[in-house]
Amino acid sequence: MGRAFEVRKASMAKTAAAKSKVYSRYGREIYMAAKAGTPDPETNQALKRVIERAKKEQVTADIIKRNIDKAKGGSDENYAEIRYEGFGPEGSLIIIECLTDNTNRTISDVRKLFNKAYGKLGVSGSVLHQFDHKAVFEVEAPENKLLEILLENDVDITDYEAEEGVVTIYAEPTEYGKIADVLKDNNLESKEEAIMFIPMQTMEIKDPEEQAKFDRLIEGLNELDDVKDVFHNVISSGE
């Protein structure tokens, strides 16, 4: 299952995604989490998790507070979580997760990018079944110590990998909050953490022109304001 974060990191690294995009994305997530529950992260676990992730991305305290205050103020602004599935160059598989206040705009923007890459959007489930949906944590800690802590706290993991002092934990998405709490309670900090889609099989695109089309497609998707995350099954040569 390896290198869960590498595919996503490689994709994001090829974009010129400004901090403003990260701020905007987390601003929406914080606002929606605060609006869906209480605006207090101590009593709203979903809000607490989003804030923790936002801080790791250097989202400022002002942006966090501003979006919580907006939710407190009873703003009628609303966002829907939408997922699209599609096929890129050479049959590559792509999942796009969006948070949008205008689904017509979002689907139009996403479809245009797929059309430019000579790809196509699929129906719901056409791509999803070829990915595992997992909570993933990368933790810099001794393997035996970390596994012992997880076992003692009845954390149910589905798999793990250890390489050069970093342990990658895989679990069902429902275990995300529990794992985060256990790590924090034991003074362990994750280098990376996310609920993500991991391809069951990866592929390489051999043709340079097709690879360029794929890169432009992923870059374009990541640059859309409504797009929260992009997952795919392509690895570059040499990875």
Curated annotation (Swiss-Prot):
Keyword field: Cytoplasm, DNA-binding, Transcription, Transcription regulation
InterPro entries reported for this sequence: Integrase-like_N (IPR017856), TACO1_YebC-like_2nd/3rd_dom (IPR048300), TACO1_YebC_N (IPR049083), Transcrip_reg_TACO1-like (IPR002876), Transcrip_reg_TACO1-like_dom3 (IPR026564), YebC-like (IPR029072)
Principal location listed in the UniProt entry: cytoplasm
Gene Ontology annotations for the cellular component aspect, listed alphabetically: cytosol
Transmembrane intervals: none
Localization of this protein: Cytoplasm
Superkingdom of source: Bacteria
GO molecular function terms attached to this record: DNA binding
GO terms under biological process: regulation of DNA-templated transcription
Family matches, as NCBIfam families: PRK12378.1, YebC/PmpR family DNA-binding transcriptional regulator
Similarity comment text for this entry: Belongs to the TACO1 family.
HAMAP family per record: Transcrip_reg_TACO1
Name recorded for this polypeptide: Probable transcriptional regulatory protein ACL_0044
Species this protein is from: Acholeplasma laidlawii (strain PG-8A)
